Amino acid sequence: MTRPVLILLCGIPGSGKTTWAKNYISKNQDFVHLSSDAIRAELYGDENIQGNPVEVFTLMQKKAVESLNAGHNVVYDATSMTRKDRAGIISMCPKFTHIQCNIIWAPIETCIERDTTRERTVGKEVIDRMLKRFQMPYYDEGIDEISIVQPGNFNRDTYFECIINAMKIPHDNPHHQLDIYNHCRESFNYAVEKNFDWEIREAAYCHDCGKPYVKTFVNTKGEFSDTAHYYQHQCVGAWIACGLTFNIHTIWLISTHMAPFLNEKYYKNLSPYLKTMVDQLHECDVLAH
């Protein structure tokens, strides 16, 4: 007997979630496709009407649970960018469900470009806001399997080179004497010297890869300053890193590396095993100056 499967999709607008879902279901007809857009159309007569998110996802979760309880497999097609977003459906799944999370990924610029050609466009500002909320899915959420789906024509070597080159800019911040790239390289060297696990080393090498994308001289009050700010760079960096590696642990570390600085509740509640990993990356980050 096989367990019913929930494939939870995760990705920003334009990443290709619905295209992936339709293609997958055409080859796996034992799956039910539930999408937040289709639920909006059902509730409000038009998927372009955002409506009440609570109403939309309550109905979507209800349909998913009914299908799983009936023994059907489900593709759950929504952005699911944060742990809170994902917790709604994960917590409601029957205990026998095999939960798989597929991150449907594409470079940020590709997603923004695709969005401009869609009938229902959300715009760059909305995509940027969603990127700054991204929390890398991880196994402590109750997920059994996590995969990254990259575009078929994607060249990872070229992308890696572009990201590294983008990091070769000054921090313009008193907390850092080195530029972004050399800070990350020194973090990596420190991890090697300390003989930390490969995931720590890999995360150290590109933990600040989101900084060039978010760099701003405007503070949270909207005031211009001489100091550069990098708000939510760990979130954007985690999305970027999905194109650099398939190592889920590495990307989760990048996504979480600011948690000790911010004293997040999530970080404080981590198991000793996971907290040690985050603390080791934090050590590399702090001492690489």
Regions picked out by a protein language model, each given a short descriptive name:
Residues Y76-I89:
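Acidic, metal-coordinating catalytic cores used for nucleic-acid/nucleotide bond scission
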Residues T19-H72:
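Conserved substrate/cofactor phosphate-moiety recognition/catalytic segment
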Residues L6-L8:
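Short hydrophobic/aromatic beta-strand immediately N-terminal to the Walker A/P-loop
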Residues V149-S225:
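Acidic/His-rich, divalent-metal-binding segments that scaffold phosphate/diphosphate chemistry
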Residues M1-R3, S67:
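Phosphate-binding P-loop
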